[in-house]
Swiss-Prot record:
The keyword Metal-binding is annotated on this UniProt entry: yes
Cofactor(s) named in the record: Zn(2+)
EC number(s) reported in the record: 3.5.1.108
Pathway the protein acts in: Glycolipid biosynthesis; lipid IV(A) biosynthesis; lipid IV(A) from (3R)-3-hydroxytetradecanoyl-[acyl-carrier-protein] and UDP-N-acetyl-alpha-D-glucosamine: step 2/6
Reactions accelerated catalytically: a UDP-3-O-[(3R)-3-hydroxyacyl]-N-acetyl-alpha-D-glucosamine + H2O = a UDP-3-O-[(3R)-3-hydroxyacyl]-alpha-D-glucosamine + acetate
Protein known as: UDP-3-O-acyl-N-acetylglucosamine deacetylase
Active site: 264 (proton donor)
Binding site for Zn(2+): 78, 237, 241
Function recorded in the entry: Catalyzes the hydrolysis of UDP-3-O-myristoyl-N-acetylglucosamine to form UDP-3-O-myristoylglucosamine and acetate, the committed step in lipid A biosynthesis.
Species this chain originates from: Aromatoleum aromaticum (strain DSM 19018 / LMG 30748 / EbN1)
């Protein structure tokens, strides 16, 4: 049986919020089976609970943000991506600010935190969301699609018309029947352009952004002295974001995801399109030996409980 997972112990981190630029304290705690991922704004009186839920997504400008009863928590996608990549189902996330810390701009530090806490299996079957028929969402030349697949595969293509990006791979397929989240995806950083900084900061965005937590480009080149972590780091970060955005549905997907020029908004819309068509999905568990698709077994063998 493929079981649900949570943390063995509590782990803490401190960092800076990407958009607000203020210090943020983060605490990750174990949670009971079938809890899901729940964010807690512990700086509010009374504290506010914000469960991971695609219908709570309120802000998709440059990140995925959740809102409930007027309380918000932003930039959840990198942590959600790491949680999905390591197969963690149940987690309490305490945060004392309106956004999570950006850390190094990838999911790598969150993977380290989760692995440092230890991951343990629970006495409940993992509940997958299996896509039964194709669904699609389009806006102009941007689109995203989910199709039936016996595993989890993501294909993404980007168009930026920038020399630093164009000389890298601008399309990628990550199939977890073959690839490792930790090795192949987790370290891809968010990216931005110097020409956009003044405009973003005028709108209260990217106040905490720096070369320490993003790939930054001028008109021609990458400004980070250490260069890129992957030859296709730009499009790989889009895959990283998509994994986190999709995990807001509350379950690991059995699906093939494909997207062109998509972002947080389209990822949220495709989840809503899927969930609102009850004939397009079902909940699946693998409780008997031999029932588990090989792709699923491989994915969680590469991210074992510790």
């Amino acid at each position: 049986m493929i079981r649900q997972r949570t943390l063995k112990s509590i782990v803490k981190a401190t960092g800076v919020g990407l958009h607000g630029g203020r210090k943020v304290q983060l605490v990750l705690r174990p949670a009971a089976p079938d809890t899901g991922v729940v964010f807690h704004r512990v700086d509010l009186d009374p504290p506010c609970d914000l469960p991971a839920d695609p219908y709570s997504v309120c802000d998709t400008r440059m990140c995925s943000g959740l809102e409930r009863n007027g309380a918000k928590v932003g930039t959840v996608e990198h942590l959600m991506s790491a949680v999905a990549g390591l197969g963690v189902d149940n987690l309490h996330v305490d945060v004392d600010a309106p956004e999570l810390p950006i850390l190094d701009g990838s999911a790598g530090p969150f993977v380290f935190l989760l692995q440092s806490a230890g991951i343990e299996e629970q006495k409940a079957p993992k509940r997958f969301l299996r896509v039964k028929k194709a669904v699609e969402y389009r806006e102009d030349d941007k689109w995203v699609r989910l199709e039936p697949h016996d595993g989890f595969r993501l294909t993404f293509s980007i168009v930026f018309n920038h020399p630093a990006i164009d000389k890298t791979s601008t399309s990628v397929t990550v199939d977890f029947a073959e690839h490792s989240y930790v090795r192949d995806v987790a370290r891809a950083r968010t990216f931005g352009f110097m020409q956009d900084v003044d405009s973003m900061r005028a709108h209260g965005l990217a106040l905490g952004g720096s070369l320490d937590n993003a790939i930054v480009m001028d008109e021609y080149r990458v400004l980070n002295s250490d260069g890129l972590r992957y030859v296709d780091e730009f499009v790989k970060h889009k895959v990283l974001d998509a994994i986190g955005d999709l995990y807001l549905c509350g379950h690991p997907l059995l699906a093939a995801y494909s997207a062109h020029k998509a972002g947080h908004a389209l990822n949220n819309q495709i989840l809503r399109v899927l969930l609102e068509d009850r004939s397009a999905w079902e909940i699946a568990t693998f409780e008997q030996p031999g029932m588990t698709p090989a792709a699923v077994s491989h994915q969680f063998e590469l991210a074992p409980a510790t």
